[in-house]
Amino acid sequence: MNPNQKIITIGSVSLGLVVLNILLHIVSITITVLVLPGNGNSGNCNETIIREYNETVRIEKVTQRHNTNVIEYIERPESDHFMNNTEPLCDAKGFAPFSKDNGIRIGSRGHIFVIREPFVSCSPTECRTFFLTQGSLLNDKHSNGTVKDRSPYRTLMSVEIGQSPNVYQARFEAVAWSATACHDGKKWMTIGVTGPDAKAVAVVHYGGIPTDVINSWAGNILRTQESSCTCIQGECYWVMTDGPANRQAQYRVFKAKQGKIIGQTEISFNGGHIEECSCYPNEGKVECVCRDNWTGTNRPVLVISSDLSYRVGYLCAGLPSDTPRGEDSQFTGSCTSPMGNQGYGVKGFGFRQGNDVWMGRTISRTSRSGFEILKIRNGWTQNSKEQIKKQVVVDNLNWSGYSGSFTLPVELTKRNCLVPCFWVEMIRGKPEEKTIWTSSSSIVMCGVEHEIADWSWHDGAILPFDIDKM
């Protein structure tokens, strides 16, 4: 066979294969379009597939048309009812670890926000850790000077509980240097306070959208709880302060429904001081244990009813729970007046258990170090010093900080009572340590029906960081 014949033969074979391939495709399309629909099949294969991406559930509806996938992203369905939250608190014999974020340890090499004032709040399906960022990362030059409380860079963000406050999983909530947040059963409501000291504004967000505002009424650093607000049957309550931190200020309770303020009342508390309340629902009322930054080493107590009537006083227990404070033996306690004659203070919490009270406090009397929780017999109603139980959460060799309360709703636990929980902030850096920054991590504990051994779940980061050595 000469070269020309070889070329003709190869070309003929190739052309034949191409024609055969085309015929096969025509037959395949004919069977798919004409035969299958004739058997009562629409030609579409519809199914909903649930896949997990980056620890967030995303629902995909996949429609197959003639070997082509059409993917539609469906938003997670919202609950159609409000949480009740009128149940009593569960009785707690001890508190077990729920989560620990280790944010500062991870932040020596990870992309972790510089934060303060972390707190936890829960919806019917999840609990989230909220925190106030400084608009900067750990081990970065912008972390310099973040000991400052108020700046235009501070924002409220959140992650699923247990996650570190990292840039990849954090969700923006509000521009804020003071904040609170809670879920009514349908959507998250957040309140972020920002702006100049004399004319600060609190912006209410509902479902991520700004829905209302509160302007400063006393012109002196409008501020709020730095912990979870409280929703009962769709109505959410929170406490705000405006005025001096070291003498008489002004205090108000607000009520909102679906992000719109529907009521407010001024708290008359002459001679007393209320800041940074830690609140929780209990038997249809909101119970708050707050901070007296003026004189008292006992904590203010505020009980709010649905009509915004209230009872205000001090935690009766004969042991102080603020810091700094004097000796336990020298403290007598009062249900109505500040005791101890110590200025300054730290955010804290307590839980009523009948007439008894669980109250948290730093172990140190003079600094924010160590943390313990005590159960005082009749401490909610009397000046009792009788400790029923004590549990150490952070030993006195390690730094602590703010602490606050929240509850696990019955939708999460399937119980007939609300589980009492608390978090402890562990502040690192300035002013106690030689760094250019101030930040914190947290440990979260929840009430259980068993006693829990003492231990120290402290922060554990080794300081200084590289940025501090430059």
From Swiss-Prot:
Q: Which domain of life is it from?
A: Viruses
Pfam families attached to this UniProt entry? Neur
Q: Where is this region: Head of neuraminidase?
A: 89-470
Summarize where Ca(2+) binds, as residue positions. D292, G296, D322
One cellular component term (GO) for this entry is:
virion membrane
| Swiss-Prot/TrEMBL GO biological process terms | carbohydrate metabolic process; viral budding from plasma membrane
Chain positions covered by the region annotation Involved in apical transport and lipid raft association: 11-32
Q: Could you tell me the EC number(s) of this protein?
A: 3.2.1.18
Family that this chain belongs to: Belongs to the glycosyl hydrolase 34 family.
Could you identify this protein by its name? Neuraminidase
Which source organism does the UniProt entry give?
A: Influenza A virus (strain A/Turkey/Minnesota/501/1978 H6N8)
